[in-house]
Amino acid sequence: MAEKVAIFLFAGPEMPCRMIHTFIWALDIQRRDGEVKVILEGEAPRWLLVLPDPDHGRHGLYQKVKDAGLIDAVCKACAVQARAVEAAAEEGLRLVHDASGHVSLMPYIEAGFRIVTL
């Protein structure tokens, strides 16, 4: 049975290694025929203000993850705080607010996903 993993990234640009590992692991899980979803929570929506820039050093990694459809949701409350709502929309990413403005864990748990947080 293929693994199902939901990775909740909470770290913003002040902790780049967490974003890098989230994206590397997501691509690795997909490559190994697992199902993976990345969720941007906490400070992570701030990445949407810098990663879409082709001159950013990690733009290529971000673009691979985005093009693969692995970014499942962006927390709406956190995107509002980060002033990243427009950036999420421009990137075609889904803003979710089903748990008091944040992304609920329950749809992922009910679908059999393991939850990983960074």
Identify the residue ranges that each predicted region occupies.
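Glycine-rich phosphate/diphosphate-binding loops that line cofactor/substrate pockets in enzymes
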Residues: 1-4, 30-32, 109
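Residues at the starts of beta-strands that form the adenosine-phosphate
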Residues: 4, 34-37, 71
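Short, glycine-rich nucleotide/cofactor-binding loops
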Residues: 6-20, 45-53
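Structural beta-sheet core signal
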Residues: 7, 38-40, 74
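Histidine-anchored nucleotide/phosphate-binding helix
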Residues: 18-33
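Short, glycine-/small-residue-enriched flexible loop/hinge segments at domain edges that mediate gating
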Residues: 33-50
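A glycine-rich helix N-cap at a beta->alpha junction
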Residues: 54-84
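C-terminal structural segments of small proteins and small subunits
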Residues: 87-111, 116
